[in-house]
C-alpha cells in the first residue's frame, strides 16, 4: 500500500506501519505502553478516545521512535498541546 513512512497521510496508518516494522501484535504494543488492547486497536482504526491521554501518546511515540505529532490527528494534537487550557484562559 505505502512504500515509505513519509507516504502515509493518516496517523492511524502510521501507527500500524510502525507496529509492523517492529513485528509486534496490537496486544503487545498495548501492554508495552500500559493501555488496553481495545484502545490501541481503535487507534489503528482511526478512532480516538478521551482515554488516549497525552502520556500514552508520548509513550507510543517513544516506542516507535517518531515525533508525537506524527501519530495524532489535528483534534487530538490540539488537546495534547493543552489547547483546552489555553482556550479557558480567554
Give the role of each language-model region.
Residues 19, 30, 61:
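The alpha-helix within a helix-turn-helix
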Residues 34-51:
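Recognition helix of helix-turn-helix/homeodomain-like DNA-binding domains
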Residues 25, 36-38, 67:
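Short coil turns linking two alpha-helices in DNA-binding domains
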Residues 44, 56, 75:
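DNA major-groove recognition helix of helix-turn-helix
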Residues 23, 47-62:
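Short, basic-rich loop-to-helix N-cap that marks the start of a DNA-contacting helix
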Residues 15, 29-30, 40-43:
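Conserved hydrophobic/aromatic packing and binding residues within compact polymer-binding modules
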Residues 1-21:
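A short, Lys/Arg-rich alpha-helix, primarily the initiator
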Residues 2, 62, 70-90:
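Short, charged recognition helix plus adjacent turn
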Amino acid at each position: 500500500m505505502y512504500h515509505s513512512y513519509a507516504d502515509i497521510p493518516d496517523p492511524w496508518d502510521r501507527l500500524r506501519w510502525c507496529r509492523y516494522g517492529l513485528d509486534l501484535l496490537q496486544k503487545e504494543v498495548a501492554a508495552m505502553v500500559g493501555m488496553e488492547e481495545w484502545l490501541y486497536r481503535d487507534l489503528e482504526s482511526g478512532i480516538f478516545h478521551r482515554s488516549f491521554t497525552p502520556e500514552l501518546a508520548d509513550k507510543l511515540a517513544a516506542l516507535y521512535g517518531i515525533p508525537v505529532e506524527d501519530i495524532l490527528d489535528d483534534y487530538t494534537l490540539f488537546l495534547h498541546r493543552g489547547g483546552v487550557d489555553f482556550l479557558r484562559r480567554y
